[in-house]
Amino acid sequence: MTRKFLIPTENQEQRALVKWLSLHPLLKEYFYKNNNEGKRTEAQTWNLKLMGLRPGVSDLFIPYPSKTKLYAGLWLEVKRNMHYPPSARKSETWINQEIWIERMKGVGFDGHFCYGWEDGKRIIECYLSA
């Protein structure tokens, strides 16, 4: 019998990263999740857009400056820890996420895609020492 190891979902990866952040002595009070995803009716989507919903906004934001004050905060887009084919990276959603991160980098923030919660943890630890 062959055992199949499942790759955790994006939701599971983000929950694991949030759990780690919730225990972090410095950052536990300095992060939040952007509620940009989900299935909505046309009316809900329209209403949220009127309220400021923007495509591509990253999943997590840590509004805490890096050690050297080089960055004012860190934006993280959480992805599953798996290989993504080039076609997936060309989707409208992915492109909007890349645009958001580049836009934020242009105004004093840092931003990254992380592939699994452990990659997110590594990025955050590097950010804190920058």
Q: Model-flagged regions — what are they?
A:
Residues M1-A130:
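Catalytic phosphate/metal-binding cores of nucleic-acid and nucleotide-processing enzymes, i.e., regions
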